[in-house]
Amino acid sequence: MYTILLVGIGGFIGATLRYVFGGWIQNSFVNFPVGTLTINTIGSFFLGLIMYFSEYQGLFSDQTRIFLTIGILGAFTTLSTFGYESFRLLDDSKLMLMSINVVSTVLFSMMAVYLGKTVALGVSSYLLGGMK
């Protein structure tokens, strides 16, 4: 029950952050879903960072990891909005923009996870004497 509460609290935090930052970022862009792309990229970076710290250093307890990854980042990032916005671009006959959105979201998210892992490895090596 405690873990479910942690996920719920994390979800509240993540969803609120997504609403505030996603809207703020998107306000400058009308024709392309930059807000969702940015949110998903940032979330992917932090997921890579947290998971590698958690998996290789045991830096986070299981409950902390669940709170951060499933709760906060799960609500912060948004696959459903990405799908909806991509379909809207396609529905509006903006095939090129839709393609750019799909490819850039997948590539940026994967690169961000890799960057998060790289930062975790670097910080770990510098502060903690390297990964196990």
From Swiss-Prot:
InterPro entries in the record: FluC (IPR003691)
Binding site for Na(+): G74, T77
Presence of the UniProt keyword Signal in the record: no
Disulfide bonds: none
Catalytic activity: fluoride(in) = fluoride(out)
Principal subcellular localization: membrane
Gene Ontology terms for molecular function: fluoride channel activity; metal ion binding
Regulation acting on activity, per entry: Na(+) is not transported, but it plays an essential structural role and its presence is essential for fluoride channel function.
GO CC terms in record: plasma membrane
Membrane topology according to the record: Multi-pass membrane protein
Compartment list: Cell membrane
Keyword entries, A-Z: Cell membrane, Ion channel, Ion transport, Membrane, Metal-binding, Sodium, Transmembrane, Transmembrane helix, Transport
Keyword Hydrolase: no
UniProt record, GO biological process: cellular detoxification of fluoride
Transmembrane feature ranges: 4-24, 32-52, 66-86, 95-115
UniProt-listed HAMAP family: FluC
Database matches in NCBIfam families: crcB
Family assignment from sequence similarity: Belongs to the fluoride channel Fluc/FEX (TC 1.A.43) family.
Function (record text): Fluoride-specific ion channel. Important for reducing fluoride concentration in the cell, thus reducing its toxicity.
Protein name as catalogued: Fluoride-specific ion channel FluC 3
Organism: Methanosarcina barkeri (strain Fusaro / DSM 804)
